[in-house]
Amino acid sequence: MANLIRGLSENGGVVFCGVDSTEIVRKAEKLHTTSATCSAALGRLLTGATLMGSMLKDDRDRITLRVAGGGPAGVLIACTDGTGNVKGCIDNPLVELPAKANGHLDVGTAVGKDGVLTVIRDNRLQKEPTVGQVPLVSGEIAEDLTSYYAYSEQVPTVMALGVLVDKDLSILCAGGFMVQLLPGATDAEIDQLEKNINAMPSVTELLHAGKTPEDMMQLALAGFDPNVLDERDEHYQCDCSAERTKEMLLSLGRAELVRMRDEDPNCEVVCHFCHSKYQYDLNALLAEYDAQAAQAAEAEHPVQ
């Protein structure tokens, strides 16, 4: 069964997207060995990125979310594309903090709110990425993403995200939903939507009780006669490769490659998102760089 759905109200004025991201967050926890609080923080960001990525119009488009709040967890990053793949990382995955007075994990303090949320959109039809940036509201992720839509894209949006972590640090459930109002929404529709969402249990309560993204849609859009537009599977999937990593090294330029070679001719690159390791002989890379440079020079100034 697909873990993400997109829906629309009967009159076309309200868009809904919901996801059960439990398996995504479980894989992230396994890869990064996160503490409970960091699992919640990174899991929320991955879930939010998944929801945003589902709105991309082209499979080759990408969104990168970067949260730098000055908290002990450090910088959090999540990347997603139009095909349902998402990946993420966190600077300090082992940071743990006391729970808040209500017993909830203190994600806001771990992330911090003295900083910014940066949203980078790579659109294949544009030469340069579009970058939006807003101050963090709380560091709790959902409020910060909602604020981004309000101030950077001027789209009335509600986003709810949740990650439930067990005592053994395993992920019991994770997910979220996003509701957006299209132009022309009436005050009555806005009031009804607010009442619906305020009356809903939390995302983790719903998922832990066996509810689905479609169930969340029916609750959030009660009275709007929503219909499911489409559904698909979302996965934690890193797109790194030996070839892409080699191209990244070559792009550093000859001087940097020489400096690195002089320190150690054997280079190991570790992916931040999946911890895959790639080994390179820098002498061989320098030879390849020189061959490419010579070929480029010959193409620019061919021998007559």
Q: Which residues does each PLM region occupy?
A:
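Cys/His-clustered metal-coordination modules, chiefly Zn-binding fingers
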Residues: N198-Q304
